[in-house]
Amino acid sequence: MEIKNSTLASDTKASHLSYIGDAKVGGNTNIGAGTIFCNYDGKNKHRTIVGDNVFVGSNTSLIAPLKIGDASIVAAGSVISRDAPSESLAIARPLQQNKIGLGKKIMLKLQKAAYKIKR
């Protein structure tokens, strides 16, 4: 875990493989493994504020500037780019789609391309 220019209040847990930059994180909050606080837009750094009693699921990206209100939940795997009010569930990820037969078709194309490169 890496923390830069950030404060974490008491009883807050942040797991391995997370990056917390330019943030203020409230108390009794859980930051899941692999969560990234995306604070830099290529020109400026922005802050993220996470309230008290918040649960952020694993492999989540929080795109600053952003505020997550108290007692909220952020669903695992989400890319959150808008504020989440207190006591809300923030979920931002596309639904899974299963394209029957497409996996095999893509694998065959990749195998043919790899064969051409090796020759």
Where is each model-derived feature located?
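Glycine-rich hexapeptide-repeat left-handed beta-helix
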Residues: 1-119
